Curated annotation (Swiss-Prot):
Pfam families: KH_1, RNase_PH, RNase_PH_C, S1
Domain (KH) ranges: 580-640
Catalytic activity: RNA(n+1) + phosphate = RNA(n) + a ribonucleoside 5'-diphosphate
UniProt-annotated binding residues for Mg(2+): D513, D519
GO molecular function terms noted in the UniProt entry: 3'-5'-RNA exonuclease activity; magnesium ion binding; polyribonucleotide nucleotidyltransferase activity; RNA binding
Record-given protein name: Polyribonucleotide nucleotidyltransferase
Residue ranges of every copy of the S1 motif domain listed in the record: 650-724
Gene Ontology CC entries for this record: cytosol
Domain of life according to the entry: Bacteria
Enzyme kind, highest EC tier: transferase
Primary residence: cytoplasm
NCBIfam families recorded: polynuc_phos, PRK11824.1
Length: 728
């Protein structure tokens, strides 16, 4: 609905979206950008801006950059740290940026190479506003109304399920009770991007939620089209890519047979990946064409400026890549033979080992074909949980999975800096896949960190991470419900505009990922799916294809799990001897201050008395005691429990004599007695008998059990006892 406004340049549009008004304002803010929109949903306000560079570049891909920025003022917060301003993007910001990028990128024309930036600034945030969906819609609409050649609207929704009811855009509280959380994006006709974390959901229930969410997406896409038809700018014309036919024929005649021989050879040469062989061949081809023109004065190559020389060599590279792509795809579609010789449903060979690293708390090495993940588990106290301080309330995150992809994993030289967006995204996917099989905090009161080191990579490294990590967790004694395996599925279609024939690929490798049409990562147990992520490189796929991919992936997942179970099929009964031992006790919240004491004196005394044991006290009365030695943990637990058994003045207790106390003249003047394990009191020599005692040892013996009365407890908690006053 278009609403009239006093500002002639400002256009306002509204739609009812899940019982709330989604309002869009255009024309007042960021007017110098190619396209900009302000979106209002509940209390969330997001500014989405699209900007395009003027010049086409010589790259073989679209230089698209997506930034999703959560300004902390949007939630009424001042940033922490010394500078008190926003710094590097948070994990959540990176994940949302990747989500928008993966959804929108496939919808651009392959011939459009201008630099494009999409900026999404969260200016006001409603905790239940589902900001990622609003930002994606804003990015799509900003592109649609701009002069940037983007023509197909895309929208997204979140779907949850509580009981038998499917819910669109569940609130934070609903997410906690939902059996899954799905983010779905697509056009009015097909799906573009899917992400989900779930509690072992079945394939049928997942497909049901996909269909349910796509109906809402269709309405939002139609809404965007109506706006673009009213106020959209004239689009920049995309220059047609005129293929140099003579050059194409020449390269094909020279190199087609050699490329085909490399791709159809079932054996790798000296274990070198075919992608590396093709890369070397392409480098030689480019060098040959460069030398050809440098040595031939009649040609005009030397007369071209540097930029046009790059464009010419880029043309050579495009033709070479097209030949590789054509051979791979036609061989798969027509002969059902993949670059490594497998058929479409075949999984690469799998080997696994556990306990690779002796001093770590748990480790596993998972190898599938040319991809290898080493997963390491570290257990810590709950105070070592990660603190998440973003637009929502501050929370502690006890399970962390970090994915590292060093350059040597693909035989390259690289810089080792902060984790990349890709590393953060892959780590988060693996983390989601494992969360639902982890024990609760009450059953296993540890913080858990898993690190996946990718040591070799030829596709599906994120899924190898899931397999290695679940095995490492079991080896560390973390009581998982079951093993989790992941597999990456691919798709080759005959026509990206109208799919008539297609082949689904199991366990894709690097070449198939690069030259294929989808990368569909699916993780789960034998019961159901725990996480998935779909990246589509074409305009979309139908629900029918989606269903068949899931069916094949389930069979593959079970095969992989069967291989993993040969190495370890259940969690160990105990954690590693090098891992800290922990116990939890529950006390009344009002007793917490008694344990802590004035200025922390009591808790510090307990810690010092018990070999610097770690003690975490929660507001709800849970106390976690952790130490490398289980005996220390047990002693600390007993001490705290006995400490809370209130020693009262005038009460009589049965005690054990522990030791005598002597003065400077080495004469005994009292005894230390144990009231409860960990709780001690002092008996002065004058309080032993009704007559004068010269030596304590004349009346008492070490280890003797006697009755005493508590006669005093001073402000420091020290207890005075009397033997002679027991019957008074």
């Amino acid at each position: 609905m278009d609403l009239n406004t006093k500002n002639n340049n400002k256009k306002v549009f509204e739609i009812i979206f899940e019982n709330n008004v989604l309002r869009i304002e255009i024309g007042e803010i960021s007017r110098q950008a190619n396209g900009s929109v302000m979106l209002f949903y509940k209390d969330t306000v997001i500014l989405s801006v699209a900007v395009c560079g003027d010049k086409k570049n010589s790259l073989n891909f679209l230089p698209l950059t997506v930034n999703y920025q959560e300004k902390l003022y949007a939630a009424g917060k001042i940033p922490g740290g010394f500078l008190r301003r926003e710094g590097k993007p948070s994990d959540q910001e990176i994940l949302c940026s990747r989500l928008i990028d993966r959804t929108i990128r496939p919808l651009f024309s392959k011939n459009f190479k201008n630099e494009v930036q999409l900026i999404n600034m969260v200016l006001s945030s409603d905790p239940d506003g589902n900001n990622e969906n609003i930002a994606l819609l804003g990015s799509s609409l900003a592109l649609l109304i701009s002069d940037i050649p983007f023509f197909e609207p895309v929208s997204s929704v979140c779907v949850g399920k509580i009981g038998d009811n499917l819910i669109i855009n569940p609130t934070l509280s609903q997410r906690e009770n939902s059996s899954f959380f799905l983010i779905l994006a697509g056009t009015k006709d097909s799906l573009n991007m899917v992400e989900m974390s779930s509690k072992e959901i079945s394939e049928n229930n997942f497909l049901e939620s996909i269909k349910f969410g796509h109906e809402i997406i269709k309405k939002l896409c139609l809404f965007q089209t109506e706006i673009a038809n009213q106020i959209g700018k004239t689009k920049i014309k995309i220059p047609l890519h005129n293929v140099n036919n003579l050059l194409e024929v020449e390269i094909k005649d020279k190199y087609f047979s050699e490329i085909e021989m490399i791709l159809k050879n079932k054996c790798n040469v000296n274990n070198v990946k075919k992608s590396d062989i093709l890369k070397k061949l392409k480098e030689n081809v480019l060098e040959n064409y460069k030398e050809k023109f440098l040595n031939n004065k009649k040609d005009n190559f030397n007369l071209l400026d540097l930029e046009n020389q790059k464009l010419y060599l880029n043309e050579v590279e495009i033709i070479f890549d097209f030949l590789v792509r054509t051979i791979i795809r036609e061989t798969i579609l027509k002969e059902n033979i993949r670059p490594d010789g497998r058929n479409s449903s075949e999984i690469r060979s799998i080997t696994s080992r556990i306990d690779i690293l002796p001093r770590t708390h748990g480790s596993a090495l998972f190898t599938r074909g040319g991809t290898q993940s080493l997963a390491i588990v570290t257990l810590g106290t709950l105070r070592e949980s990660k603190i998440i301080d973003d637009l929502s309330d501050e929370v502690d995150k006890r399970f962390m999975l970090h994915y590292n992809f060093p350059a040597f994993a693909v035989g390259s030289v690289g810089r080792y800096l902060a984790p990349s967006r890709r590393e953060i995204g892959h780590g988060m996917l693996a983390e989601k896949a494992l969360e639902c099989v982890l024990p609760s905090e009450n059953d296993f009161p540890y913080s858990i960190r898993v690190v996946s080191e990718i040591l070799d990579s030829n596709g599906s490294s994120s899924q190898a991470t899931i397999c290695a990590s679940s095995m490492a967790l079991m080896s560390a004694g973390v009581p998982l419900k079951s093993l989790v395996a992941g597999v990456a599925m691919g798709l080759i279609v005959d026509d990206i505009d109208k799919i008539n024939h297609y082949t689904i690929l199991s366990d894709i490798e690097g070449l198939e990922d690069y030259q294929g049409d989808i990368d569909f990562k699916i993780a789960g147990t034998k019961v159901g799916i725990t996480a998935l992520q779909l990246d589509i490189k074409i305009k979309g796929i139908t629900l029918e294809i989606f269903e068949k991919v899931l069916e094949q992936a389930k069979k593959d997942r079970i095969k992989i799990l069967n291989e993993m179970e040969k190495v370890i099929n259940k969690s160990r009964n105990e954690v590693s001897k090098y891992a800290p031992k922990v116990k939890m006790i529950l006390i009344k919240p009002e007793k917490i201050r008694d344990i802590i004491g004035s200025g922390g004196k009591i808790i510090n005394q307990i810690i010092e008395k018990h070999d610097n044991v770690k003690i975490d006290i929660m507001q709800d009365g849970k106390i976690y005691i952790m130490h490398q030695n289980m005996e220390i943990v047990d002693l600390t637990v007993t001490y705290i429990q006995n400490f809370l058994k209130k020693i009262k003045v005038e009460n009589v207790y049965e005690v054990k004599i522990l030791r005598f106390v002597k003065d400077k003249m080495d004469k005994t003047f009292g005894a230390i007695a144990e009231i409860f394990p960990g709780i001690e009191g002092f008996i002065h020599i004058s309080k032993l008998e009704n007559y004068k005692v010269d030596k304590v040892e004349d009346v008492l013996k070490i280890g003797q059990i006697i009755l005493v009365k508590c006669i005093k407890i001073n402000e420091r908690g020290q207890i005075d006892l009397s033997k002679k006053d027991v019957f008074k």
